[in-house]
Design a protein with these regions (language model features):
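A ubiquitous short alpha-helical element
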Residues: 1-5, 51-55, 461-464
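Anion-binding and metal-coordination hotspots
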Residues: 7, 68, 76-89, 100-524
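Short, charged, low-complexity loops and linkers
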Residues: 16-24, 47, 460, 464
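A general alpha-helix detector
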Residues: 19, 63-69, 106
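Basic, short loop/linker segments at the boundary and entry of helix-turn-helix/winged-helix-like folds
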Residues: 26-66, 72
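Helical catalytic core of nucleic-acid polymerases
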Residues: 41-43, 53, 87-97, 104-106
């Protein structure tokens, strides 16, 4: 008889210590993170978790919160499946989760359902604790924006203007159809109202009335080759078709809203923008979000996600968000050329902020001496004692009218002046481009603001602030994209994208805080 001896043994014996933290260095980022988070009351963000009396015990929500935040601190951006894997193999994540390994679905539910409503409060409280510890100066705020490509198909655009044109063409088709139906219904006494525009509800009502008059039964309709549709069937089907198409156009225009001209079919919150990183090589517009940050002492003090293509429209919402968080406006908001506009300068004056935002022609004004001193520029025309502006040829420029500037919120007006007579002028080729008398537009208030901005930025303090902005604000996006590999939005929908950006910003600030604490410890 054959005897099989099976030896049940484990050559690897358990060893001491059993505590994970004994394997970690005292300056390990997870220990710095855990000590810092221990000073914040995390339970208040987790009060809305639904309670269940049956089923398995839930994971500790405080540990889940710490694990998620540390994942974004350590990786820059971390996916749900990476979180699950790290909890199984990484000592740091094991330490935070106490050897438990939730599934990616559990992490997804926790982030989307539990953190979604409290993530901004978490961001603010973590920031306030860091700023209090590090004595961060919030009076100097360095602002920058970057367009992040959305998680949407590249050729899924819907253009608002194209939709509006299609809708007006459809209005014409509806009018033609109504005229045909009215001729058909002369004997019945029924008549459809003809307008320049129509609502989908009116077309549905008209289809119901038309079906009632002719006793139309859709089950008796014929389709396909060899069948001839009756006039009533054709008219009824067109009414239904036009109503559905009109409803589609109304929905598309509603999704676009008043502030943007496009959206993506796969992510309605994404707007098509021109992105600097043109990896397609054809200057193609791509669905994206405009992410704005305000940086103070290398920390992200305020962050916002916008659907505007221009940075100019993002400045005021960002400053209002800063005020809501900290209770005051920064004294020195420093921004690049994309933020300098009349609206933003007036807003700074109203809120007691200095003007340190460049305007579009600043570089040409300050570096191109020929352009700055050009005698044929309207701002360089001399004004006599009688208050009349004159050109280099001595001709008077008379005020024609004042007009409101499009898109202005504060009633900005331009003064339009015209030369009294340009005929026979020896400087005509240098001064004007048409055969008519030269017309110029002047906004003296904006010109004075530009001069103030130039003086601010050309001062010693202005030069230091400009240098710091390029280091801190642009450097923040450089770290995000190139060091921590967060180059594209993962989630869809403005609310989910804002949640994602807050998590990335919290991770960035905790990462900065750990590095600074490590330098202090090394210096000591």
């Amino acid at each position: 008889m054959e005897i099989n001896n099976i030896i049940y043994s484990n050559p690897k014996q358990a060893v001491l210590p059993m505590l994970i933290q004994d394997y970690l260095d005292i300056c390990d980022p997870v220990l710095t993170f855990d000590r810092f988070m221990g000073e914040i009351e995390l339970e208040k963000y987790l009060k809305n978790i639904p309670q269940h009396d049956t089923g398995r015990l839930r994971y500790d929500p405080v540990s889940m919160l710490k694990t998620v935040l540390f994942g974004f601190m350590a990786n820059g951006y971390i996916s749900l499946r990476e979180l699950e894997d790290q909890c199984k193999v990484n000592l740091r994540f094991m330490y935070l989760m106490d050897h438990q390994a939730p599934s990616y679905r559990t992490f997804g539910y926790f982030i989307n359902e539990v953190l979604a409503d409290s993530i901004e409060e978490i961001f603010q409280d973590i920031n306030k604790k860091i700023f209090e510890t590090e004595h961060v100066d919030l009076q100097h705020l360095y602002i920058d924006g970057s367009k992040f490509e959305a998680n949407a198909n590249k050729y899924s655009w819907v253009w608002k203007k194209a939709t509006e044109k299609s809708r007006y063409r459809l209005f014409g088709k509806i009018t033609t159809l109504f005229e045909e139906i009215n001729e058909e219904l002369l004997c019945t006494g029924m008549k459809l109202c003809i307008n320049s525009e129509y609502a989908p509800e009116y077309l549905k009502e008209a289809a119901e009335q038309y079906a009632e008059v002719w006793q139309i039964n859709e089950a008796m309709f014929v389709h396909g080759r060899g069948h001839r549709k009756t006039t009533q069937q054709r008219h009824y089907e067109k009414l239904k078709e036009y109503a559905a198409k009109l409803e589609e156009y109304v929905e598309k225009i509603k999704i676009c809203g008043e502030d943007r001209n496009s959206y993506s079919k796969t992510d309605h919150s994404a707007t098509f923008m021109r992105i600097k990183t043109d990896y397609m090589g054809n200057d193609q517009l791509l669905p994206a979000y405009n992410v704005q940050v305000g940086v103070a002492d290398e920390y992200i003090a305020v962050v916002d996600v916008n659907q505007y293509r221009s940075d100019m429209d993002c400045f005021i919402p960002l400053m209002n968000k800063f005020y809501t968080t900290y209770g005051f406006y920064p004294k020195y908001p420093v921004a690049d050329v994309g933020y300098g506009s009349y609206n933003n300068y007036i807003f700074c004056e109203q809120q007691g902020m200095e003007k340190y935002m460049k305007f579009p022609m600043l570089k040409k004004e300050t570096t191109d001496k020929k352009y700055h001193e050009d005698p044929f520029r309207a701002v360089n025309f001399p004004i006599g004692e009688d208050g009349i502006m004159r050109c280099p040829n001595g001709k008077n420029f008379n005020l024609q009218y004042r007009k409101n500037v499009k898109g202005n919120k504060y009633g900005r007006q331009e003064e339009v002046y015209q030369c009294e007579d340009c005929s026979g002028c020896p400087y005509a080729e240098q001064c004007k481009k048409t055969d008519k008398n030269r017309t110029v537009r002047i906004n003296r208030e904006l010109t004075a603001m530009h001069q103030e901005v130039i003086e601010n930025l050309e001062s010693i303090q202005g030069a230091l602030l400009r240098m710091n902005r390029s280091i801190q604000a642009e450097g923040t996006f450089g770290i995000m994209k190139n060091d921590r590999w967060y180059k594209r939005i993962v989630r869809r929908g403005i609310k989910s994208v804002l949640l994602e950006v807050f998590l990335v910003s919290i991770g960035h600030n905790l990462y900065k805080y750990h590095n600074k604490q490590k330098k202090v410890a090394a210096a000591a």
